[in-house]
Design a protein with these regions (language model features):
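Short, low-complexity disordered leader/linker segments with a strong preference
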Residues: 1-67, 92, 119, 141-148, ...
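Hydrophobic alpha-helical
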Residues: 119, 124-146, 224, 241-308, ...
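Short beta-strand elements in bilobed, periplasmic/extracellular small-molecule ligand-binding domains
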Residues: 92-104, 204-207, 229-249
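Flexible loop/hinge segments that line or gate small-molecule binding clefts
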Residues: 140-180, 200, 204, 303-311, ...
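Hydrophobic alpha-helical segments within soluble ligand-binding/sensing domains
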Residues: 55, 62, 110, 172-203, ...
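Extracytoplasmic "Venus flytrap"
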Residues: 55-86, 90, 99-112, 122, ...
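Short, solvent-exposed amphipathic alpha-helices that sit
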Residues: 79-96, 181-185, 216-236, 251, ...
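Hinge/cleft segment of the Venus flytrap/periplasmic-binding protein
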Residues: 50-60, 64-66, 202-212, 329-408
Length: 408
């Protein structure tokens, strides 16, 4: 009887241990606002979570089993979802678990989500579009609370209360090649006005751009544009911008329509340069309504832009980056930080000016001719018509184990 009792107790302990081993750890609670655990927050907002894979090559990765998050200030959009999907797919190949959180253009929600993930035990955070007026001080505080956490940032300038540019040790910053966007688009307008350029005349441009200090990407785009102004290759007919930022596209349509009435179309304006595609959409609508023949170009791209270019009218080109590549790049940088391989990040070919400053994702031009070369072109299949620079990944940071796990 005693032997039977002992046997039954032993079996009970085995089943109890098996049950414990198969359970899941409780998820961390949000730091404030009652938004729940990071995973719950993602599910509630329609965001996606990629579970870490088991087996396979993940055991060879020094970041296998790590938990990372992509936290975007803005609401979800096609290009940001492309980024998220690529970030998560790359994380999975490296053996990590990745979550995505979109923050509805709300800075307080963005900061709360960063704090929640940091408090919740995430190993790495890829944070995007934080405001220059708060990002440096806020993220510095997060790392003081969680010194083992790794952070990489996209389109998130660091400035102190005096407006001075700052750095945070161990945090890799990267941006799009904004000045490059501007340069390549001006070059497109120069090509469209070759006779004038050959004659040594300045090309007359209606510039769609906000004033200095509006935001960091626009300021960096102005740097590239200004080079052509200073060289006398272009001259501004006028600079215009929307008067209502909350309804930027419709406001830009109205502003452009009023501006066009002051000029004699192509006799006075050789081209329109737009710093942002949401503005460009309004410009294009105004040009169509006025039956204008003035060509235009714009930074950024979305499916609506592609549809407008495919109409074969005024919209001649967009400057963009490959958002699928952007997501992979972001995950690579964060993984290398977590692996302590900052030397591999520094070996990348896309640092701006000096190692340790910030990295810039290379830009590419998508032309009207490319978009019209086949039917059904979207941002999701843009690689089918864009030139080789769109799919080039030679500029990405890598190392031996990444080459093995990611293929390059």
């Amino acid at each position: 009887m005693k032997k039977l009792t002992a046997l039954l107790l032993a079996l009970a302990m085995v089943f109890a241990l098996a049950a414990c081993g198969g359970g899941n750890a409780s998820t961390p609670a949000a730091s404030n606002g009652g938004s729940g655990a990071p995973a719950a927050s993602a599910a509630a907002s329609g965001d996606k979570s990629a579970a870490a894979p088991t087996g396979g090559d993940s055991a060879e990765s020094p970041v296998a089993g790590k938990k990372v998050a992509y936290i975007m200030l803005m609401s979800s959009a096609t290009i940001f979802q492309m980024w998220s999907d690529s970030f998560q797919a790359t994380a999975e190949k490296l053996g990590m678990k990745a979550d995505t959180f979109f923050c509805s253009d709300n800075a307080d929600q963005w900061k709360t989500q960063v704090q929640t993930c940091a408090d919740g035990g995430y190993d790495g955070l890829m944070v995007s579009h934080g405001g220059q007026e708060y990002a440096w001080d806020f993220l510095k505080g997060i790392l003081e609370q969680h010194p083992d956490l790794k952070i990489a940032t996209f389109d998130t300038p660091f400035k102190d209360a005096n407006g001075q540019v700052q750095k945070i040790d161990g945090v890799t910053q990267f941006f799009q090649q904004d000045a490059g966007f501007a340069r390549s688009l001006v070059e497109e307008l120069l090509k469209l006005n070759k006779d004038k350029v050959d004659a040594g005349e300045a090309v007359r441009i209606l510039q769609v751009q906000q004033g200095a200090g509006y935001n960091s990407p626009f300021d960096r785009r102005q740097v590239g544009y200004q080079e052509y102004l200073d060289a006398g290759k272009i001259v501004n007919v006028e600079r215009i911008a929307p008067t209502d930022d909350q309804n930027a596209t419709s406001s830009m349509r109205d502003v452009t329509a009023a501006t066009l009435q002051k000029y004699n179309d192509t006799a006075d304006i050789d081209g329109i340069w737009c710093c942002y595609d949401a503005y460009a959409q309004g410009v294009y609508q105004a040009l169509k309504e006025a039956n204008s023949e003035i060509p235009m170009v714009s930074v950024d791209i979305c499916n609506e832009d592609i549809q407008f270019m495919a109409e074969g009218k005024n919209w001649k080109a967009c400057a963009t980056t490959n958002w699928t590549s952007n997501g992979e790049f972001a995950c690579r940088v964060l993984a290398l930080e977590m692996a302590g391989q900052y030397d591999a990040i520094e070996a990348s070919s896309c640092y701006d000016k000096e190692i340790g400053a910030w990295m810039e994702i290379p830009s590419t031009i998508v032309t009207q001719e490319q978009v019209m070369s086949k039917s059904g072109v979207t941002v999701e299949n843009l690689q089918d018509v864009a030139d080789a620079s769109y799919t080039d990944t030679s500029w990405m940071p890598t190392c031996d184990w990444m080459v093995e796990l990611l293929g390059h």
